[in-house]
UniProtKB/Swiss-Prot annotation:
Enzyme class, broadest EC rank: transferase
InterPro entries to which the protein is assigned, alphabetical: P-loop_NTPase, Rhodanese-like_dom, Rhodanese-like_dom_sf, SelU
Subunit and interaction comment: Monomer.
Lineage top rank: taxon: Bacteria
UniProt name for this protein: tRNA 2-selenouridine synthase
Catalytic activity: 5-methylaminomethyl-2-thiouridine(34) in tRNA + selenophosphate + (2E)-geranyl diphosphate + H2O + H(+) = 5-methylaminomethyl-2-selenouridine(34) in tRNA + (2E)-thiogeraniol + phosphate + diphosphate; 5-methylaminomethyl-2-thiouridine(34) in tRNA + (2E)-geranyl diphosphate = 5-methylaminomethyl-S-(2E)-geranyl-thiouridine(34) in tRNA + diphosphate; 5-methylaminomethyl-S-(2E)-geranyl-thiouridine(34) in tRNA + selenophosphate + H(+) = 5-methylaminomethyl-2-(Se-phospho)selenouridine(34) in tRNA + (2E)-thiogeraniol; 5-methylaminomethyl-2-(Se-phospho)selenouridine(34) in tRNA + H2O = 5-methylaminomethyl-2-selenouridine(34) in tRNA + phosphate
Functional note: Involved in the post-transcriptional modification of the uridine at the wobble position (U34) of tRNA(Lys), tRNA(Glu) and tRNA(Gln). Catalyzes the conversion of 2-thiouridine (S2U-RNA) to 2-selenouridine (Se2U-RNA). Acts in a two-step process involving geranylation of 2-thiouridine (S2U) to S-geranyl-2-thiouridine (geS2U) and subsequent selenation of the latter derivative to 2-selenouridine (Se2U) in the tRNA chain.
Protein's GO biological process: tRNA wobble uridine modification
PROSITE patterns: RHODANESE_3
Family: Belongs to the SelU family.
Molecular function GO labels: transferase activity, transferring alkyl or aryl (other than methyl) groups; tRNA 2-selenouridine synthase activity
Protein source organism: Shewanella amazonensis (strain ATCC BAA-1098 / SB2B)
Domain named Rhodanese: residues: 15-138
Active site per database record: C98
Length: 367
């Protein structure tokens, strides 16, 4: 049986170059966590894997292997090998892996060899590659000076971060804007996928040889994704840069984020009628999520303003009425909360400025 393998020392290169990977784990394993450049073409289905696992526990490895060959034989085997061939025909530079780089990788490699393809499998498999990425998250803060970009809601922190080569976009990785109204149309990655993507972005940051690591100020949770504990603790200790913006600049940004982009995204996915319903539910649901913090009276007032704005938008295609509840949300909720939180970080603040001033300051620090 072939022993054509990819050693662990190439993990970094695999992630940086985005090598296509065929993941032969069962679908249930893949769904719990995978890599951005991996495609799931399993050796066994979930039910087949379960049967083989039970057989292994009761009768040992040889019996389990024999059962596996019985379950994946004939047309079933041929169809899976055809799918693998198609993958490597499209991605001739690709690799394969299973959970530990063991038997499933070797069997898959052997069956591909039978049809004339000699495909390397990755030593250590998913488990070792995943540990490599976890270690990267833990050690990354010591490789560059971490800087935290803070700023009042609507100040444009995310847009600013995305313009800077020394930054890593945490909200982009989590697919969530990190606030009560931060949900996106596509949903968020699993926690494991979030961590894997974060680690890969940190590898890319190191590849750019940046002395600074600029991150947007975030809570421990970005939506449902948790920033890894060690990494978050370093963020809590890092110097803070405060991005300033006027109310006149902030309101159009938030109108665009909460209203224009979300409405357009839902309509694109679901059509005009269902899209508007989903968009309306997103706004009202986000407001309901902070009911306890707002209190009943304020929540009722905002709900009324929001419903009026939605009705005006639907009937007249005019979104300007949304500025009423957005203004009240800033005045009564976001702004007081921000000033309270910034007060606790006052000793860590290194610089305060507008977008232009912040760009100039960061550029003055050098690469």
């Amino acid at each position: 049986m072939s022993t054509n393998t990819v050693p662990a020392k190439q993990y970094r290169e695999i992630f940086l170059k985005g090598h296509p990977i065929m993941d032969v784990r069962a679908p249930i394993e893949f769904s719990k966590g995978a890599f951005p450049n991996a495609v799931n073409l399993p050796l066994m289905t979930d039910s087949e894997r379960q049967k083989v696992g039970t057989c292994y526990k009761e009768h040992g490895q040889e019996a389990a292997i024999e059962l596996g060959h019985q379950l994946v034989a004939g047309k079933v085997k041929a169809n899976r090998v055809d799918a693998w061939k198609a993958f490597f025909s499209e991605h001739p530079d690709g690799f394969l892996y299973c959970f530990r780089g063991g038997l499933r990788s070797r069997i898959t490699q052997s069956w591909l060899k039978e049809v004339g393809l000699d495909i390397p499998f990755i030593e250590g498999g998913y488990k070792a590659m995943r540990q490599f990425l976890i270690d990267e998250i833990d050690t990354a803060p010591g490789k560059s000076e971490m800087l935290i970009l803070s700023g009042i809601t609507g100040s444009g922190k995310t847009d600013f971060v995305r313009l800077r080569s020394e930054s890593v976009d945490l909200e982009g990785i989590a697919n969530h804007r990190g606030s009560s109204f931060g949900r996106q149309h596509e949903g968020q990655p699993s926690q494991i996928d979030f961590e894997n993507r974060l680690a890969i972005e940190l590898l890319r940051h190191q590849e750019r040889e940046q002395a600074k690591l600029l991150l947007e100020d975030e809570s421990f949770l970005i939506g449902r994704n948790a920033i890894p504990k060690t990494f978050f603790e370093k963020m809590q200790q890092a110097p803070v840069l405060v991005l300033t913006s006027t109310l006149e600049e902030r309101l159009p940004r938030l109108l665009d984020d909460y209203v224009h982009k979300m409405h357009a995204g839902y309509v694109e996915r679901l059509g005009e009628e269902q899209g508007f319903i989903a968009y309306r539910d997103y706004l009202l649901g986000s407001l309901k999520g902070i009911y306890k913090r707002l209190g009943g009276k304020l929540h009722a007032e905002m709900t009324e303003l929001m419903n009026k704005a939605l009705a005006t938008e639907q009937s007249r295609r005019d979104t300007s009425a949304h500025l009423d509840w957005i203004s009240l949300l800033l005045e009564s909720y976001y702004d007081p909360m921000y000033h309270y939180q910034l007060g606790k970080k006052a000793a860590r603040v290194r610089f305060t400025g507008t977008h232009a001033e912040m760009h100039e300051y960061l550029s003055s620090l050098g690469k």
